Amino acid sequence: MVYNGHEMEVIFMDINLSSKNEIIIKNEFSYLIDDIRRYRQDLHRIPELGFLVYKTGAYVKEVLSKLDCKIEPLVNTGFAVFFDFGCEESICFRCDMDGLPIEEQTVAFYASEHEGCMHACGHDGHMANMLGFAHLLDKYIREKKALPYNALLIFQPAEETIDGAEAIVNTTVFEDYNVKAIYGLHLWPMIEKGEIASKPGPMMARSTNVKVVFEGKSAHAGEPEKGRDALLAACEFVTKIYDYKDNFIRERSILQFGKMESGNVRNAISPYTSLDGTMRTFNDLTWAKIVNAMRNIADDIEQNIGVKVDVDVSQWHPAVVNDTSLYAKIKYALKNLDFVELRRPVMIAEDFSCFEQVLPGVFFFLGTGTGIPLHNDHFDFDEDVLLNGIKLFDTLLKTQLSTCSVDIGS
């Protein structure tokens, strides 16, 4: 998950995280808490990166092998898990599996055993939540419980490296199981413990990588007139972009540069400078406006300073845009949960958006109430919040989308 920590604080700054953070969450699925706590802590110890989630996948499959389900390999280390309730259509639930290249600084007894790698984005919790849900589905099958849909669970690698979701979309898994809709969730530190949040329409930003390269001419620092200063051109570019920032705010967008590389020695005009940054937007028009602004500024700098400027943009994720029709159908059922509707979208990006390009989908946040940001080396949470995640998935599976009814008591 790609995000801007300050933006997350701004969006949720009016929430008093201390008010519910000390509660212990209990619901009708509390009998699963020992299992999901063990799963989460075991998985937290063995974080792996990208598609290289071999230990993680083996652990999850070992748990699932004891349940009445079909495990099907997908791309690379990803896999699908099918619970057959004899229905024509299926509902899909997705979780991510990979960790981050972060050295853990918690003192938890279940801290990462893999040096330089940590589950700092809660994917261990997402998997534990899904395994708890799988236990519930297995129970329903043993009880021969009638449900409106089959359940397809997707365990996705490489969310952090942006490859996983797109690779799965390019398979035929959704057609093979006649999937009607897809749901997912993400642990969220900036809302109350156990609270579930979502919204119709745009929820999370489109993420675009931006790289700007400046090519000038080297010269001695004592004779700057003989060179063309790429570093000066880069500074001019950033200054002009930041002068344009009021437009970004009006358009609900961000353009932020966080990395600069230039020169090799202190006493020479730099012939080469590069800037790396990120852009967050919610629609194509705003995206095009910002890209055009960067290219216009680049043209001005080329003419005024004589440095060649190349602006390269490459998309990471499209925006997470929850299907408004699907959201309207499930919203009634969500009233039985600790649910709140987000006021506005967030600038964080998530590759769940790739699934929403091909299926109606809704994404949710599940509050940890800690206030510790994602991608932080102290990230942690209480596993009891996952009980509400299981309840959410159970409610969604039982919601009959054609009639908008749900068997809440079952």
Describe the function of each predicted region.
Residues 92-94, 103, 210, 363-368:
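Non-cysteine beta-strand/loop elements that form the S-adenosyl-L-methionine
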Residues 43, 93, 123, 153, ...:
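Divalent metal-coordination and catalytic microenvironments
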Residues 14-119, 124, 128, 135-149:
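Acidic/His- and Gly-rich active-site-bordering loop/insert found
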Residues 1-12:
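Short, Lys/Arg-enriched N-terminal segments with co-localized hydrophobic residues
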Residues 13-18, 232-410:
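Metal-dependent amide/peptide-bond hydrolase catalytic core
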Residues 94-96, 129-130, 184, 272:
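Structural signature of FAD isoalloxazine-binding scaffolds in flavoprotein oxidoreductases
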Residues 100-102, 107-118, 124-125, 140-270, ...:
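Histidine/acidic-residue-rich, glycine-tolerant segments that coordinate divalent metal ions
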